[in-house]
Regions:
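Hydrophobic core
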Residues: 10-14
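Active-site acidic/histidine clusters and adjacent loop/turn architecture
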Residues: 49-114
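A generic structural signal for short, non-catalytic loop/turn and secondary-structure boundary residues
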Residues: 20, 49-54, 115, 136-138, ...
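N-terminal module-boundary/linker segments of secreted carbohydrate-active enzymes
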Residues: 20-67
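Active-site-adjacent loop/helix surface patches within enzyme catalytic domains
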Residues: 99-141, 147-152
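Catalytic cores and adjacent binding grooves of peptidoglycan-active enzymes
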Residues: 127-134, 140-216
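Sec-dependent signal peptide recognition
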Residues: 2-8
Length: 216
């Protein structure tokens, strides 16, 4: 109830400041200054997508302190409407997200972004599970939510790899702790309802932060 009240009060403050909260959830083509900042960070050649395939989203979200924040996401235009709908509903339900910042603010460093528990989408990089091929993030078709509490986990030849490494306390999904995404979590249910696959349901690896949609 308190979080919902904070959202209402913040929305009123936005309106008195002359900005329509509904307009805070919007989709636009990638502005020149944003695309320039992506060079050598999230956008590296060869890239599997072009600038015109991408969209910049602006969303509101509730942070871990229960306060309203504004975030930005770059994604493939094919999932832009899905993400706007999902993040609007997450916000309306005061779903806590620690950070939503463009990964370019971390110089395109996925590990640094995850350590900061930053939610992000587009980033031209290889698959985590192999040295060849692009990650679905490179197409802007995947997003990671609260990654510090929902790590990538892979065990091979008796060796367990955790990303980010700082997420080791959250690998045991039988434990109860805040910000854990499971199959009954609102975030998971919303993404699945929009046709996304959840990495936490994979067999060979577990990627609890990860939601992706097929490009085709």
């Amino acid at each position: 109830m308190l979080k919902r009240l904070l959202i209402v009060l913040t929305s009123l403050a936005l309106m008195t400041g002359g900005m329509d909260p509904a307009g805070s959830f919007r989709i636009e083509e990638i502005p020149d200054e944003i695309f320039e900042s992506m060079q050598g960070r999230s956008f590296n050649e060869p890239a599997p997508v072009k600038r015109e395939d991408l969209r910049l989203l602006t969303v509101l979200y509730t942070d871990f302190e229960g306060c309203t924040q504004k975030g930005q996401i770059i994604c493939n235009k094919k999932i832009a409407d899905d993400l706007i709908d999902i993040f609007r509903e997450l916000y309306e339900n005061a779903y806590p997200i620690e950070s939503i910042r463009l990964i370019d603010e971390f110089d395109g460093d996925d590990k640094a972004s995850m350590r900061a528990d930053n939610t992000s989408c587009f980033n031209v990089r290889p698959k985590s599970s192999s040295r060849s091929g692009f990650s679905s993030h490179a197409y802007g078709m995947a997003i990671d939510i609260n990654p510090l509490y929902n790590p990538y986990v892979r065990t091979r030849d008796g060796v367990t790899r955790i990303e980010p490494e700082e997420a080791a306390p959250y690998v045991d999904r039988q434990k109860d702790f805040p910000h854990k995404i499971d199959s009954q979590d609102l975030c998971c249910r919303l993404f699945r309802a929009h046709g996304f696959t959840w990495g936490g349901a994979w067999r060979s690896v577990k990627d609890y932060q990860h939601f992706e949609k097929s490009l085709n």
